Amino acid sequence: MSDKVLVIGAGPNRIGQGIEFDYCTVHAVWAIQEEGYKAIIVNNNPETVSTDYDTSDKLYFEPITLEDVLNIVEKERPIGVLTQFGGQTSVNLTVPLAERGVRVLGTDPDDVDRLEDRDRFSKLLKKLGIPQPESGTANDPEEAVEVAEDIGYPVLVRPSYVIGGRAMEIVYDEEDLRRYIEEAAKVSPEHPILIDRFIEGGIECEIDGARDEAGNVLIPGIMEHIEEAGVHSGDSACVVPPQTLPEHAQETVLEYAEDIAEGANVIGLINIQFVYDPEEDEVYVIEANPRASRTVPFISKAVGIPLAKIGTKAILGREIPEVLDEMGLEPPDGDPGIVAVKEAVFSFEKWPGVDPVLGPEMKATGEVMGIDRTFGAAYWKAQLAAGHELPLEGTAVISVADRDKPDIVPIARKLQRLGFDLLATRGTASHLREHGIECEVVRKVSEGSPNIVDLIREGEIDLIINTPTEGKDARRDGYAIRRAAVKFKVPYITTIAAAKAAVEAIELVKEKGVTVNCLHDIHKGDWTPREVKPEELTRYGG
């Protein structure tokens, strides 16, 4: 009998599929070797650890296509193929490989399809009694309008089977929807679009978990998204443990996650995304991915549990409690003893025409993390690592959409209390003054000079809070402000949730300073810090 296992890598780096999956691939290889098998990798990205000469027992530097993988399987005769660790690229090969008689290790290909296929997944959730946002599928523009009206605006629309939320958008009315169909998506029976109810003000969160054949489930923790629902999970900062998700909602998330893993007979890894609606006090399931996700490295490092390695051993027949015991690890209790923040890294300075506003279409090209004992300090460290050094003083410009004006008041008040001078565009300034917050009015780009962009160019602005607004002039103004911020390296924030987090971080660092700790010490529970003044830290670290 063969003693080889073939692992399919993630292929080239691109938005939505990056080096996080290579981390998972390498950990899978190490687990395979520890279990006494030879690990073979197929990947075609030279900028990865998985394609280093000494990572696997054999490397095939070939395209990640069905034909190439079948040729390798025919030559090597492995006991099976692992498709869970190369992101959506490798998962998409699961069913085609199984149909051609190849043994796919882990979750059965039919169960993979049950989680990937919208209709089958909806039926599974219905059977399990788990709610999901109302949704529908449209094969032509008129059907899309009907479905959206039945669900009720706003809705989230996207083509089926996408990586990184490409061509995904939140639409607020029929005119918006028709424009989306015309510009972004060709709708046909072969290429339907998916339409979901968008939960405004919802708190998104997700879990990465592993399950073995005996039914043991391991969930290291819940990652709460800092951005509001509607920002792609790959672009949103997230935090472990959750900071605003109620305790009972966290319990529901864990319960639903275990039910889905069991209901779909998952063997190996699974990622499930949820949204909590505070108004209805209801947790909804958005989607489940039967594979390693881009957050596996983050949650693994945040709680000190190598999830990809444990998931691989579960796929190879080991039981999770036994593996944890072997590694000297305790099952997580939901409190890692630290606060860890993951922040997305963007390359907007290299993309002159792209609006650096966050939305449902992924734009991040990497990620970093900050660790501390408080959320504010961890968030500040994550921003610093991502190249955004939050200012502790200076001038802040605020220009927000009408829907965000009630929420900006406490943020502006806190900035003023922290010693910032405030500038605001006319509408925002009027709202702030009504609530007793003094600020100067600054012109929008469309209102002539000197305007916000002129001040950014002259180095007079230290922080920008600018949420996207509707209307042609408003969109053009916002775009010009955000592009100027990128060009002149001024920290800019495009969501209310991120603004709240940033102000909390500024307040904490300004009042208490920040500490630097060794990662190894943190996982041993040793918090003997070196006190560091904020000014001693540079944009590139401490």
Swiss-Prot record:
Organism: Methanopyrus kandleri (strain AV19 / DSM 6324 / JCM 9639 / NBRC 100938)
Domain MGS-like: 388-542
Positions of Mn(2+) 1 binding: 273, 287
Keywords: Amino-acid biosynthesis, Arginine biosynthesis, ATP-binding, Ligase, Magnesium, Manganese, Metal-binding, Nucleotide-binding, Pyrimidine biosynthesis, Repeat
Cofactor note text: Binds 2 Mg(2+) or Mn(2+) ions per subunit.
Protein name: Carbamoyl phosphate synthase large chain, C-terminal section
Catalytic activity reported: hydrogencarbonate + L-glutamine + 2 ATP + H2O = carbamoyl phosphate + L-glutamate + 2 ADP + phosphate + 2 H(+); hydrogencarbonate + NH4(+) + 2 ATP = carbamoyl phosphate + 2 ADP + phosphate + 2 H(+)
Region (Allosteric domain): 390-542
GO MF term list: ATP binding; carbamoyl-phosphate synthase (ammonia) activity; carbamoyl-phosphate synthase (glutamine-hydrolyzing) activity; metal ion binding
Assembly notes: Composed of two chains; the small (or glutamine) chain promotes the hydrolysis of glutamine to ammonia, which is used by the large (or ammonia) chain to synthesize carbamoyl phosphate. Tetramer of heterodimers (alpha,beta)4.
Binding site for Mg(2+) 2: 287, 289
GO cellular component annotations of the record: cytoplasm
Residues that coordinate or bind Mg(2+) 1: 273, 287
Chain residue ranges for the region called Carbamoyl phosphate synthetic domain: 1-389
Annotated CDD domains: MGS_CPS_II
ATP-grasp domain ranges (all copies): 122-316
Gene for this chain: carB2
UniProt-annotated binding residues for Mn(2+) 2: 287, 289
Free-text function comment from the UniProt entry: Large subunit of the glutamine-dependent carbamoyl phosphate synthetase (CPSase). CPSase catalyzes the formation of carbamoyl phosphate from the ammonia moiety of glutamine, carbonate, and phosphate donated by ATP, constituting the first step of 2 biosynthetic pathways, one leading to arginine and/or urea and the other to pyrimidine nucleotides.
InterPro entries, per the entry: ATP-grasp, ATP_grasp_subdomain_1, CbamoylP_synth_lsu-like_ATP-bd, CbamoylP_synth_lsu_CPSase_dom, MGS-like_dom, MGS-like_dom_sf, MGS_CPS_CarB, PreATP-grasp_dom_sf
GO BP terms, alphabetized: 'de novo' UMP biosynthetic process; glutamine metabolic process; L-arginine biosynthetic process
Biological pathway: Amino-acid biosynthesis; L-arginine biosynthesis; carbamoyl phosphate from bicarbonate: step 1/1; Pyrimidine metabolism; UMP biosynthesis via de novo pathway; (S)-dihydroorotate from bicarbonate: step 1/3
Binding residues for ATP: 158, 197, 199, 204, 230-233, 273, 287
Cofactors demanded by this protein: Mg(2+); Mn(2+)
Record remark on domains: Corresponds to the C-terminal section.
